[in-house]
């Protein structure tokens, strides 16, 4: 099987798991990396045995066929657009970009040039997301009527060495973490029809306590840090969504869906595995372990946590492998830019509804991605058992 050369632009914290995982996926090969700053690019290049280039040089490099855009959100549009105009396929970290208009421009540019444009999250393609999709599609819980979705924490300044961008326009919990939850929901339920929301800024300033050169500095918060939304799907399902970086502790499940025949709990959509829980009518919850399915086995533990055995399934790059397979085999890929642009429109609609009040209608419509079977998923992996 031919490998596509991959160039990574953006060598920050998230780049390590991408560079580490790329070596285990079939159809892709890490060729080079670049960053607006030379030092982080050189550090990652030396660590993973690839070339460190300038961004312009990477975009011109004939060995690079797929550009993976890991820059900060406010640079996503410029880097992805430049890569497309250079004739490269692109896979971007979430969000696709900051504005809905720029998202549509990227989708149009990729389509016009016949290039593949993908976007994280790809976590819904993991073992937990696939099993949840099987349960919903199989009708085990009936038609989904309602649900809840929660991401709440103290924020990013306690662990990230350079957290300023999280609190600028294009950041906040909805644009940073919302894509995981909304992509998981759209994969299960289809497109969103409308949103209502309330938003607030819990703290006007954030004190950086993470180790690093910014420790002790203060960040002025420019974007809402709590979003509470009612999301109406075209299917008729209503989901209550809460995203907040103003919460010390809570007890909510990441995603719960309530159907006509039962209920479903979907594991943390920031990762690829976890335990899916399902109940039929008033029966007890059934706990369904996904660790024996492709991309369900724990392989990672956060470096900021005390050392211990891996406890999370973190197979970032699965969407890149799916995109590469689509290029090599002429098949559709799943984490598409159109899908990500719909999610982006929904997130921006929440911010608009929070600022203006009322209901914001979603203009775009998307099809759910084709289900990824365990057998097909396994063909993407070339490393140790996933």
Model region roles, listed by residue range:
Residues 54, 91-92, 98, 117-119, ...:
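Hydrophobic residues in well-ordered beta-strands that form the structural core
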Residues 66, 72-73, 77-124, 139:
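Beta-strand-loop-alpha-helix segment that lines the small-molecule cofactor/substrate pocket
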Residues 204, 208-222, 228, 233, ...:
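C-terminal glycine/acidic-rich active-site capping loop/insertion
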Residues 1-48:
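N-terminal Rossmann-like dinucleotide-binding module
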Residues 49-57:
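Conserved SAM-binding strand-loop segment of SAM-dependent methyltransferases
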Residues 115, 142-146, 352-386:
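C-terminal capping/lid region of NAD(P)-dependent oxidoreductase domains
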Residues 123-220, 357:
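Predominantly a Rossmann-like dinucleotide-binding segment in NAD(P)-dependent oxidoreductases
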